């Protein structure tokens, strides 16, 4: 497939940076012809693949950001570790249903691949283009089901969780499109993250879990980028790393700022790629 494939990685609210990245790509005449998405990056990619304009997606994300999506499951205080997650999955699903309704992968204007993790096999599983078929909302809830926060999602008898557990920036999946160029926008955990400047302090158990998973995700991304460079015959990869903060998964008050940072970082990366 001739053209640019965009890989929009996971990062919670920071995934709004993908909207700025999309805007920068289109301004340079590099509008993606297909998308690979993971976690909330898959939500952004799905909206764009359906043909929505970046500005419209940003408005919808800001609107959804005002909803109470992170709702603590009250039974956690009664049953403790017998529960599957800290948060109720219903509000997250309701938000995605409000955004996408009954949309399916077959409705996409441009092809979309979403990465999820099979909790039992540990495999990275793809849905959509070059992968399995399932209702779009089910797959989006699954790829956003970060363990501890949200429970696994059962699709076709298999338990799936956040795609970022296996690959928060699934660049290899872009190769299935046989693209001329890949642009990967990384808003996931990294060893370059700045300390959080605002927001409530996380409880110790959650902070330790989040930091531990983040270390694994960050190293996994570095390993994949190194492998890409060392593997002959792969298309050019433009890596975009917006400036992000730690513990900003639910920082929905910063969506517009993240979108602008994605725009800045993508313009900078595209300029550097020409030199």
Predicted regions and their residues:
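Patatin-like phospholipase
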Residues: 1-38, 46-275
């Amino acid at each position: 497939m001739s053209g640019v494939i965009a890989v929009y990685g996971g990062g919670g609210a920071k995934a709004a940076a993908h909207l700025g990245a999309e805007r920068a790509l289109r301004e340079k005449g590099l509008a993606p012809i297909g998308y690979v998405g993971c976690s909330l990056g898959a939500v952004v990619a799905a909206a764009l693949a359906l043909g929505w304009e970046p500005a419209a997606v940003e408005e919808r994300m800001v609107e959804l950001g005002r909803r109470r999506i992170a709702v603590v499951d009250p039974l956690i205080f009664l049953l403790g570790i017998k529960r599957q997650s800290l948060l109720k999955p219903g509000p997250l699903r309701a938000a995605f249903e409000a955004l996408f309704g009954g949309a399916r992968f077959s409705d996409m204007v441009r092809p979309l691949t979403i990465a999820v993790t099979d909790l039992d096999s540990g495999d990275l599983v793809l849905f959509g283009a070059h992968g399995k078929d399932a209702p779009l909302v089910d797959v989006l809830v699954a790829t956003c089901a970060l363990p501890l926060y949200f429970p696994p999602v059962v699709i076709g008898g298999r338990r799936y969780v956040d795609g970022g557990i296996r690959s928060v920036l699934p660049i290899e999946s872009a190769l299935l499109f046989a693209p001329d160029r890949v642009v990967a926008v990384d808003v996931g955990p990294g060893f370059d993250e700045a300390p959080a400047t605002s927001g409530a302090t996380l409880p110790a158990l959650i902070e330790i879990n989040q930091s531990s998973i983040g270390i694994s995700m960050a190293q996994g991304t570095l390993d994949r980028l190194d492998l890409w460079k060392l593997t002959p015959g792969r298309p050019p990869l433009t890596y975009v790393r917006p400036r992000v903060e730690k513990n900003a998964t639910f920082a929905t008050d910063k969506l517009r700022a993240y979108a602008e940072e994605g725009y800045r970082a993508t313009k900078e990366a595209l300029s550097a790629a020409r030199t």
